[in-house]
Amino acid sequence: MKNKFVELVEKSQLRNDLPEFNPGDSITVNLWIKEGDKQRIQAFKGFVLRKRNRGLHSAFTVRKMSSGMGVERTFQTHSPLIDSIIVEKRADVRRAKLYYMRGLTGKAARIKEKV
């Protein structure tokens, strides 16, 4: 049970401008990157490997293949560094956590698209 003051502060920090997405969906995460005194937006495109729903502490992991090597990045859902999330494709998967995809390559690593 959380303190009512903590709940009130956390509720004000939650973002409601992000789209709904699920594990397996192909998404593009546009996030702010700071290099020295400059800021720019960088896109990270891949599929959602897992999603953790914990209110303000929610997070999701996106996996992509870069030069034949798998790259995973975990994002805090309500982070101010995330500019936008674009859902490219919806997937039809039977698991909530797609850790088995780490060991698959080529055609075996394909995800069925939701019709």
UniProtKB/Swiss-Prot annotation:
Pfam families: Ribosomal_L19 (PF01245). HAMAP family: Ribosomal_bL19. This is Large ribosomal subunit protein bL19. InterPro entries: Ribosomal_bL19, Ribosomal_bL19_CS, Ribosomal_bL19_sf, Translation_prot_SH3-like_sf. The gene is rplS. It comes from Francisella tularensis subsp. holarctica (strain LVS). Coiled coil: none annotated. Gene3D superfamilies: 2.30.30.790. This protein is located at the 30S-50S ribosomal subunit interface and may play a role in the structure and function of the aminoacyl-tRNA binding site.
